């Protein structure tokens, strides 16, 4: 049974609460009003694609993907940036359904693939992603330059 669909602006109140839980999970301060503004901007500006999982009319999880492009390959990819399922609903297949939505978005948009990163210590994710067909990409190093002024303020 399919429990997932594309998010709409009508989902913002519930989605912002889930997004806030996700951010708190990653040790960020709770800020539901800012979460709602951030998500509203993503949806209205079509900056990302967001899919939600629901049970009995309540949102229990979401996945957010951003479009990226490879110049050398001359193609689009989707960056699976955020995946979250409320702790009371984990282990019930919602993450897999949300990942399937991401893969279907890739197929429908004729993108070359879905990319993601996860921490080496994320045992659940490091089991989930290969089980969903993702392959660990060992042929590159991932580097980050962080704008310390902005990072220190967030």
Whereabouts are the PLM-identified features?
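Conserved acetyl-CoA binding element of GNAT-fold acetyltransferases
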Residues: 75-87
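Conserved acetyl-CoA pyrophosphate-binding loop and the N-cap/start of the following alpha-helix
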Residues: 89, 93-101
